[in-house]
Amino acid sequence: MASVSHTKPAKKSFRVGRVRAFLRGRVWYLCYHENGKRHQPRVGPDRQSASQMAAEINAQLEAGAPSALGFEPISIPDLRDRWLEHHEHVRRSSLQTISRYRAATQHLLDFVAQVRPLRRASDFRPVHGEEFVRYLRSKRVAPNGHAHARKRTLRDCGIRFILETCSTLFNYAQRHRHLPPYVENPFRTIEIGRIPIEDAKPVVAFTADQERRFLEACDDWQFPIFLTLVMTGLRPGELTHLLLPDDLDLVDGWLFVRNKPNLGWQIKTRNERDIPLLPELVDLLRFVLGDRRDGPVFRQRRCCGDYVPPLRGHTRRTLESEMTRRIPRADASAEGSERKLRHAAAKTLWRDLGAIKPDWVRKEFMGLTRAIGSPEVTAPKTLRHSFATSLQDANVDPLIRNELMGHSPGCVSGVGNTLGMTAVYTHTRPETKRRQLEGALRARPAAAIAKVWLAKRTFETRGPDDSPSAQANARQEASFCVARPVGEARSPNSPMTFEARAGKADLRVSAEHNGVPGSPAAT
């Protein structure tokens, strides 16, 4: 009679301390709780490997350390969505910043979808990061984002920004335990900071001659706008969102850069500041504004004619009420869309106020730089660079420079700041700020050109002031400005000069009639 085998079947589960292992089909899984959350990671078909992993995780749980498998696997597209939502709802980053982050991380999503398919963010290794850099260097993109624009390869600074953004994305994944514990950020091994920038556009600051030719090329609508940028260092968005009467004091000569959250606009750094105005700029703004006491300081070109903005005459309070009325009720389930709806409503509000779009400032700037033979200069922030350079040339105190530029918080807390607590305890008096700014800008031709421009417009409006003192001042001011003859060859698309528009033969002719401007009629 044959013997019968009584071998016991292998157990399908076992426990090691706080960790239970069980067999499902042919694969071993672990089950344990960490920080109140249940984890059930897959180990593999080998029972011995499952036993070793269970013992390792149990030791980590007993020691209070993060478990080796205690992370939440997530795909890279889902990780990116969570990260952007974190910036939207938790960090409250600006919509422009979120848009830039979305565009930068889209390159990573394209890489994962087209070149290296990876199921999870935890599968992205340093070798994939290096492959991603090679992919970026070979990719051709439209520099302005338009589908039909000529494409070119990414610049080094663009590649660095994309890599820094993706590195920040994986830092978020580490903090929220979407990567295995003790696994390094795959972008950290690339050493992004050591990637050289070899093809960056040079940073340009206008020379005195370029500044003179640039301002002389402006028409009557452009001149007050760009003179203000030259003499205050404002960002274009700050200039286009100045409101009367709160942001401009022509009696004491101050310009106030203020956040306007209830009107859908805030300063880039959220840092408000006060900027003293030179007397020449005060006189010019008084002439341009006339008796207008509301609306944007600088209005659209069509407002110089018969166009009347729909919201003309509204006060700050009524504008805020109008803003609230224009925001449609956001769906309760679509919390993230509220800011976008508010942003869209703000754009229409400022348009109906007659405000200039910041992009229009850039278009006008590019037209002027083409007219003076510098088509490669395309960014209005060139004027901001020139302003900062003028402060440096005049040895303006670094703290005052930071305040005038709106960089004070970054100076106090920035890396490499040598002033330390001195910057915190230093409070600049308004008269000190005004004195140093005037000393810096007096060396530039802008103030003298402003006087000549205002003298011409005043002469055209009221007639000349023939007093000896006025004529002496006119000769002194005109000596700073080298006039361009009317018959000089010009580009057919370039703006007309002062003398051509006024019908004068030479800029100095009208400068002879320079008087002290009074309270002119509204323009």
What are the roles of these predicted feature ranges?
Residues 1, 252, 262-265, 272, ...:
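C-terminal secondary-structure termini that scaffold catalytic or DNA-interacting sites
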Residues 1-77, 81, 89-90, 99, ...:
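Basic/aromatic DNA-contact patch characteristic of tyrosine site-specific recombinases
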Residues 42-46, 84-171, 351-360, 376-382, ...:
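N-terminal core-binding DNA-recognition domain of tyrosine site-specific recombinases/integrases
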Residues 145-146, 151-156, 160-164, 175, ...:
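Basic, Lys/Arg- and aromatic-enriched nucleic-acid-binding interface segment
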Residues 171-185, 229-254, 398-403, 483:
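Short, charged phosphate-coordinating catalytic segments
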Residues 175, 220-227, 231-238, 371, ...:
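C-terminal catalytic core of tyrosine-transesterase DNA break-rejoin enzymes
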Residues 232, 241-248, 381, 402-418, ...:
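A short, basic/aromatic helix-end/turn motif that makes direct DNA contacts
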